[in-house]
């Protein structure tokens, strides 16, 4: 009976909603996404300002060029494919965007509504299935567009379905449809599970709640970084597969 009462107190997956232009939107997700986007844009302008326009590169430019080259070499050696020049910057941008949106939830920013109920102001956007599906579909459309640009409007679908064995075309089709689903649910599931654990920790007595909460918040930073990295790495892999040509196998 006690477990049932405690379970009923857990509110996970609840979002603050509003109606905009006849559509119901999750305002907490919009807020977290907007803040993360503004931080990414501000960071990009800051780094761009640090990059010199002369022939002599500065320290910041050399640092990020070295990191980019090292990341490209490691990923190419791991997946055995060459990466198009525009893919890595896109993947890094997605990584930073997801990372910041995940880490915003760690900030202790709360507010109390008129009913005296205290809730987190900044929630992880990845705990909203709409957010992760939008990201996954964006990646899905982008790498197929890149594949059509590289292989042609006819060659890309043929290569996509045929693969290396013609008889596996139905399996390849199912695999392709499953990519955005698995990409989104992997991120959503891990972040959503973190929200459940935080809700469970909130049911602890106040005098001991701080300890497990602090430990989990620290671990949550690690989980958010790992999930953002996996999403970005799979983005690179999908782009490489979509743009792969027969003569590039090695």
Swiss-Prot record:
Entry-linked HAMAP family: ATP_synth_a_bact
Superkingdom of source: Bacteria
Protein name per the record: ATP synthase subunit a
Extra remark: Was identified as a high-confidence drug target.
Main location per the UniProt record: membrane
NCBIfam families for this protein: ATP_synt_6_or_A
Alphabetically ordered keywords of this record: ATP synthesis, Cell membrane, CF(0), Hydrogen ion transport, Ion transport, Membrane, Transmembrane, Transmembrane helix, Transport
Organism per entry: Mycobacterium tuberculosis (strain ATCC 25618 / H37Rv)
Gene: atpB
InterPro entries registered for this protein in UniProt: ATP_syn_F0_a_bact/chloroplast (IPR045082), ATP_synth_F0_asu (IPR000568), ATP_synth_F0_asu_AS (IPR023011), F0_ATP_A_sf (IPR035908)
Membrane topology annotation: Multi-pass membrane protein
């Amino acid at each position: 009976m006690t477990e049932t009462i405690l379970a009923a107190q857990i509110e996970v997956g609840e979002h603050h909603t509003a109606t905009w232009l006849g559509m119901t939107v999750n305002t907490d997700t919009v807020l977290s996404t907007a803040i993360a986007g503004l931080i990414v844009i501000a960071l990009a302008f800051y780094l761009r300002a640090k990059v010199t326009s002369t022939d002599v590169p500065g320290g910041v430019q050399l640092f990020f060029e070295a990191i980019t080259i090292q990341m490209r070499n490691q990923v190419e050696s791991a997946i055995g494919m060459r990466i198009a020049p525009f893919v890595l910057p896109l993947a890094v941008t997605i990584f930073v965007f997801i990372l910041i949106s995940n880490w915003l939830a760690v900030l202790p920013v709360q507010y109390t509504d008129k009913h005296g109920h205290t809730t987190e102001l900044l929630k992880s956007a990845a705990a909203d299935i709409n957010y992760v599906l939008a990201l996954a579909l964006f990646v899905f459309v982008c790498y197929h567009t890149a594949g059509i640009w590289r292989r042609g409007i006819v060659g890309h679908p043929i290569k996509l379905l045929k693969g290396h064995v013609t008889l596996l075309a139905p399996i390849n089709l199912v695999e392709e449809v499953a990519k955005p689903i698995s990409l989104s649910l992997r991120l959503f599931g891990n972040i959503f599970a973190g929200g459940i654990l935080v809700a469970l920790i909130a049911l602890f007595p106040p005098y001991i709640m701080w300890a497990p909460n602090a430990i989990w918040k620290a671990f949550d930073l690690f989980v958010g970084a790992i999930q953002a990295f996996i999403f970005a790495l799979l983005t690179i892999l999908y782009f490489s597969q979509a743009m792969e040509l027969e003569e590039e196998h090695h």
